[in-house]
Amino acid sequence: MLEELKYLSETPGIGGRIKVKPEDFIVREIIPKSIFKGNCQIYLMKKRNWETIAAIKEIAKRIGIHYSEIGFAGTKDRHAVTYQYISVCRDVRKEVEKLKIRDVELKFVGYGRPLKLGFLLGNFFLIRVRDVKRPELIPKIIEELKIKGGFPNYFGIQRFGEKRSVNHIVGKLLLEGKYEEAAEVFLGYPGNGMEGDEARKRFLETKDVDLALEEFPKFLRYERAMLYRYRETRSWKKAFLVLPRPILRIFIHAFQAYLFNLYLSRRIEEGLPLNEAIPGDIVVQVKRGIPLRTRTYRVTETNVDFVNEKIKRGEAMVSGPIFGYSYRKAHGIPGRLEEEILDENEVNVEMFKKLPKPMREPGGRRELLIKPRKFAYKRKEEEVLFKFFLPKGVYATSVLREITKH
């Protein structure tokens, strides 16, 4: 899926492998100082080889609270060492001090507001790339990307499912109202040697719900919840709606991300600039290096020079579509590209409004380029250590993809 997307730089890649060990991918969350004004307890959570939600659920179980009482600002990679903040709005310090969970550590850092998804500025990354073939090409790649304005802001594989890249497929089928087919993909498509793969394959062949409930491992709790609900109602739509809203939104968000990636790749393919606006574009405002995706304005023949001056000063960025029922549509050539992407995928924006309420998505805009801050690298034989800061919602793997070219 990602291999089909166009690279922005023409210089060959350096090759190499990432995430050979969790310690090769270190992420530290950066949150606003204003968070530390309130009465909730704020902890810094260090985890290794844990998914964020799984770690939070385990912590909640051990300290005797419901996992919904733990707030967090963003999900982090599983196969990594990550540092992120969590909040608990009751006194659990004694319980936390006694806590012993393998590869999870909590440190009390103060009091503040309850954390919610999106309450972060971004993340600082320290990433080791091993078995690099041509490290001498890094300066040339970086210089070429500097001229072109940055790295293409593709959504990374994490958005679609690292082990089972099916989230966007499920999302499209849900958008089309094909609930049975969506269930077959979500429940039946196997991963890459994952536990439960044989049970998934058997369900895809037999469609036997009772057998699936016997064979699906207990940790596949969302899949099992759907199977139980279908057995009760004989409705795959009702079976999907038993899932928590954040899970349902993952599917729709993944399809939106898939369409955005196609748009960005098409724009590169057609030779349209990413760091320069053309009439019809929608640009997002930038403040202190952080794109403000809800603050947008349209580019016209009249204001195009003014807008491009703002882009040069780092006060604005060209955006692409996050398709939804009320997203701000581009005009002109960019608008034509947006229509082409929708037509080729046989969807329209009104479909995002006709979804069941928990899945409806208004859409928005997303900047086309990544401009890493504090970017640096260090070579050591066949390894390269990269470090940089990225705003929230931007993928470090997309930065590395442009450098390694795979």
From Swiss-Prot:
Pfam families: TruD (PF01142)
Family matches, as SUPFAM superfamilies: Pseudouridine synthase
Enzyme class name: isomerase
tRNA processing in keyword set: yes
GO biological process, one term: tRNA pseudouridine synthesis
Active-site positions on this chain: D77
GO MF annotation list: RNA binding; tRNA pseudouridine(13) synthase activity
InterPro entries linked to this entry: PsdUridine_synth_cat_dom_sf, PsdUridine_synth_TruD, PsdUridine_synth_TruD_CS, PsdUridine_synth_TruD_insert, TruD_catalytic
Keyword set, alphabetical order: Isomerase, tRNA processing
EC number: 5.4.99.27
Domain TRUD stretches: 150-371
Catalytic reaction equation(s): uridine(13) in tRNA = pseudouridine(13) in tRNA
Annotated family: Belongs to the pseudouridine synthase TruD family.
Function: Could be responsible for synthesis of pseudouridine from uracil-13 in transfer RNAs.
Name of the protein described by the UniProt record: Probable tRNA pseudouridine synthase D
Protein's organism: Pyrococcus abyssi (strain GE5 / Orsay)
Upper classification of the organism: Archaea, Methanobacteriati, Methanobacteriota, Thermococci, Thermococcales
